[in-house]
Amino acid sequence: MKTVCFGEIMLRLSPPGFERFFQSPALQASFGGGEANVAVSLAHFGCDSHYVTLLPANPIGDAALRTLRAEGVKVDHVLRGGSRLGIYFAESGASQRASTVIYDRAHSAVSELAPGAVNWACVIQGAGWFHWTGITPALGSAVAGCVGEAIEAARAAGAAVSVDLNYRRKLWSEAEAQRVMRPLVQGADLVIANEEDLQAVLGVAVSGADVTRGALDASAYREACATVAHEFDVARVAVTLRESHSASDNHWSGVLFERESGAFHQSPRYALRIVDRIGGGDSFAAGLVFELMGGAPPARALGFAVAASALKHSIPGDFNRVSADEVRRLMDGDGSGRVQR
């Protein structure tokens, strides 16, 4: 089935391995971004995955386009223009040293995208699903207007709409995020959040949850998910739960609430030894979209999403380069890491 994702792909610059910034002269270049990561995952799962963005017409934009094509993503509706591609510097943490991300994305091409620039009726035609994240409207009021246009076109075409709230405090305040995001989220088919997004972006508190303790009670999220579902007319609400014991060791799980039935699903819990956690939430979103779009029972879809994301934590870079079959093998208990011959 055809899927469409809209957002900003960025140039990622990282020190080798677990080095500090400029510990050695080299920085490894790759590409990534919340919605692009979802598009890549969906392509690897076998979807007809389309991505919409604005890339500068220079060699860096060309390289980003080649990367998306190489991962199986359709880029027919990518626009060219703008002055620059956003950059982020990512230092991978280890043990008690946290990972660090520094953004250099002001005045990036996507932030200059104005309403009316994209023919959304053409882009969405034939699609079964449209996905966006809260990062894109945080880049500016003009591109936030583009998100609104895309949502309207998706609904008019009968496509499901999902949003990963993805709050970035380096981009905007909670007050500004809530002012912009609350109307955009209204009526979504699926809202995805992490442990803190519901409060920051929608103003919905999670009572009894303390993300600083390193242990989370999944059941504490049921009431908050139900509040989001009913207040914003959302069919399903999913939350990823990261129990961070150190930068290297996390426990990872998720929950899913269904408004119509009131069912609250909890996934299995995975112990992770982290190689790269960037893109973990995006791989969860892609897994959930893929399974729900294919008609999987919600509990099964949640399990697939968490397993897909668990595998992503073992892969350097933003992209989750795993197949649906690999995810299902992990779901079926093949998590030993033994060589596959």
Residue ranges and their predicted role:
Residues 30, 38-48, 291-294:
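Alpha-helix C-terminal capping segments
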Residues 48-137, 161, 327-341:
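Conserved N-terminal subdomain of the carbohydrate kinase-like
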Residues 18-40:
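Short catalytic helix/loop segments, enriched in acidic residues and glycine
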Residues 153-160, 232-235:
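A short helix->loop->beta-strand "cap" motif at the edges of active sites that frequently abuts
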Residues 171-260:
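Conserved phosphate/ATP/ADP-binding segment of small-molecule kinases
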Residues 34-44, 147-153:
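Histidine-anchored nucleotide/phosphate-binding helix
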Residues 1-20:
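Positively charged, low-complexity intrinsically disordered leader regions
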Residues 264-334:
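Conserved post-catalytic alpha-helical subdomain immediately downstream of the catalytic base
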